[in-house]
């Protein structure tokens, strides 16, 4: 390098102007997610948010998540419009199972080379997820890191904070023998199991964009955004004595339901109470995946499982269906000291 050479940040692969253009693109949609508790706008060093005044003893609940390798599939298929919904869903659904109302959300978007159109599409999806869950998108970080990611590949992470009344925290401690388990239908594989999904696609040699499943491309089934249950579940909690809620994510039935069960209880799942959506049948057949592995990896059509008193089950199902969910009795709780916390029969 001679004395006359003058390097810029852009020469190193970081385009500040592109980052500024992205902020300008997303300001409008971010503003739509604003809640009355939010103070200030985008661009500050930190986001300020007051607690809603209706809470007497507010407890903050936080969560963070990503979308796993579903993102790789979305990048391969050049479909970025719903991955942001997935990101929000994975965070806010984890909050609401504890009874928490999501307050605000932040995102982290990292890439090797910032493509403003792609990033704007992703963040539009994040804003849509925030609108669906009543959560304010208060800020984020866009990191252009040449040498860390290949080309325009990117990764996303989400961070959410919610609030719940201390006396109304749902922690599973009230789960008891005889409780009914109510299922909420999923919209597809949601955001879990996609390393196996991609392996099945590779081994089977199919093209997800041209392979038809129930009259639409397989890709549409696989990239269907994760369902956000927040508003329906909050309405349910306000009307029914909910004992526990499990969000069926990584680990499927076997790993997630036990997380909300107290000692000496067992969940009995009636496998005949629902039919798997066709995408799960396709995955099992194309990948020759065992039944046990399916329930361990995928939600198999069940996004959440709710435990509540048997006397309130019908009321709960009617309320949830009225809110647009597909809910049904999927099983019950029984007293047991068995090490097997979940039985699917």
UniProtKB/Swiss-Prot annotation:
Annotated compartments: Cytoplasm
Gene Ontology terms for molecular function: ATP binding; phosphoribosylamine-glycine ligase activity; phosphoribosylformylglycinamidine cyclo-ligase activity
SUPFAM superfamilies noted in UniProt: PurM C-terminal domain-like (SSF56042), PurM N-terminal domain-like (SSF55326)
GO CC term (a single one): cytosol
GO biological processes: 'de novo' IMP biosynthetic process; adenine biosynthetic process
Reaction catalyzed: 2-formamido-N(1)-(5-O-phospho-beta-D-ribosyl)acetamidine + ATP = 5-amino-1-(5-phospho-beta-D-ribosyl)imidazole + ADP + phosphate + H(+)
UniProt entry keywords in alphabetical sequence: ATP-binding, Cytoplasm, Ligase, Nucleotide-binding, Purine biosynthesis
Keyword ATP-binding carried by entry: yes
Functional pathway: Purine metabolism; IMP biosynthesis via de novo pathway; 5-amino-1-(5-phospho-D-ribosyl)imidazole from N(2)-formyl-N(1)-(5-phospho-D-ribosyl)glycinamide: step 2/2
EC number of the protein: 6.3.3.1
Pfam families given in the database record: AIRS, AIRS_C
Family listed: Belongs to the AIR synthase family.
Listed name of the protein: Phosphoribosylformylglycinamidine cyclo-ligase
Organism: Klebsiella pneumoniae (strain 342)
Lineage: Bacteria, Pseudomonadati, Pseudomonadota, Gammaproteobacteria, Enterobacterales
């Amino acid at each position: 390098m001679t004395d006359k050479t003058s390097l810029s940040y852009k020469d190193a692969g970081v385009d500040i102007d592109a980052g500024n253009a992205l902020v300008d693109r997303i300001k409008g949609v971010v503003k739509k997610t604003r809640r009355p508790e939010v103070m200030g706008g985008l661009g500050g060093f930190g986001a300020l948010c007051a607690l809603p005044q209706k809470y007497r003893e507010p407890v903050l609940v936080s969560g963070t998540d990503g979308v796993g390798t579903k993102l790789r599939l979305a990048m391969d298929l050049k479909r970025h419009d719903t991955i942001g919904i997935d990101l929000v869903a994975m965070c806010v659904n984890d909050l609401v199972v504890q009874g928490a109302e999501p307050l605000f959300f932040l995102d982290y978007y990292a890439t090797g080379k910032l493509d403003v159109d792609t990033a704007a599409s992703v963040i539009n999806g994040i804003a849509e997820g925030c609108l669906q869950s009543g959560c304010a998108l208060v800020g984020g970080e866009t990191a252009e890191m040449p040498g860390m990611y290949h080309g325009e590949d990117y990764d996303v992470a989400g961070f959410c904070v919610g609030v719940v009344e201390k006396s109304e925290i749902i922690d599973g401690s009230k789960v008891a023998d005889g409780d009914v388990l109510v299922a909420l239908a999923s919209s597809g594989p949601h955001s879990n199991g996609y390393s196996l999904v991609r392996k099945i696609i590779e081994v089977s040699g199919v093209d997800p964009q041209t392979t038809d499943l129930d009259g639409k491309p397989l890709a549409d089934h696989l990239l269907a955004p994760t369902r956000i249950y927040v508003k329906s579940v909050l309405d349910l909690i306000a009307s029914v004595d909910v004992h526990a809620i499990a969000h069926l994510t990584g680990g499927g039935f076997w790993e997630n339901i036990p997380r909300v069960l107290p000692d000496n209880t067992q969940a009995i799942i009636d496998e005949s109470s629902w039919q798997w959506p066709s995408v799960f049948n396709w995955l099992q057949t194309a990948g020759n995946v065992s039944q046990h592995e399916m329930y361990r990896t995928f939600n198999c059509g069940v996004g959440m499982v709710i435990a509540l008193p048997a006397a309130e089950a019908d009321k709960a199902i009617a309320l949830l269906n009225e809110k647009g969910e597909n809910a049904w009795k999927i099983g019950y709780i029984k007293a047991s000291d068995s090490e097997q916390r979940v039985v699917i029969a």
